[in-house]
Regions:
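Positively charged n-region of N-terminal signal peptides that target proteins for export
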Residues: 1-5
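Bacterial N-terminal signal peptides
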Residues: 6-16
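A beta-strand edge to alpha-helix "cap/lid" segment located at domain peripheries
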Residues: 17-154
Length: 154
């Protein structure tokens, strides 16, 4: 009986190394990740880099632009990559994240400067809904509202 118990214990311990379980992410880690991703999304509208968007926008993502038009993941990536580069810069300001189990709601704002046109400076206030699927946080829904902002003082 003892050899069987030792063999069983060895098999259990070995399986933990061969088939590691996903690392449990703390809420603080998830919050940092979400805030970082929100910053990458804002920056991508000026840079055209869609690498981060491809990772954190869910395949079934659906967003609403300030003008009320709806867009999906494919549209967001296409517009960011090949659309006109409207913004010189775009960066997040504050981002607040609240968790509800495997769902998180991120609310924040970002400030931008256009290459041309009016208004030259502005701000988006937004709400993004994140869902944890298979251990990965992804945005499933987004809504943006455009608000006026004064030109920065230099």
């Amino acid at each position: 009986m003892k050899p069987f118990a030792m063999l069983f214990l060895a098999a259990v311990l070995y399986s933990g190394f061969v088939f590691p379980r996903p690392m449990q992410q703390t809420e603080a880690d998830a919050e940092r990740y979400i805030i970082e991703c929100e910053g990458q999304w804002a920056a991508s509208s000026a840079s055209g880099d869609t690498t981060a968007l491809q990772r954190f926008l869910a395949d079934d993502f659906l967003g609403v632009d300030p003008d009320g038009s709806m867009y999906n993941k494919e549209g967001a990536i296409s517009e960011t990559k090949t659309g006109p580069k409207t913004f010189v810069s775009n960066h997040t300001n504050e981002v607040n994240v609240r968790f509800y189990g495997d769902t998180a709601v991120a609310q924040g704002s970002e400030s931008w400067e256009r290459r041309s046109g009016q208004p030259r400076y502005g701000r988006y206030v937004w709400t993004d809904t994140w869902v944890r699927r298979d251990g990965n946080w992804q945005i499933v829904a987004a809504e943006d509202v455009e608000v006026a902002e004064k030109a920065p003082t230099k």
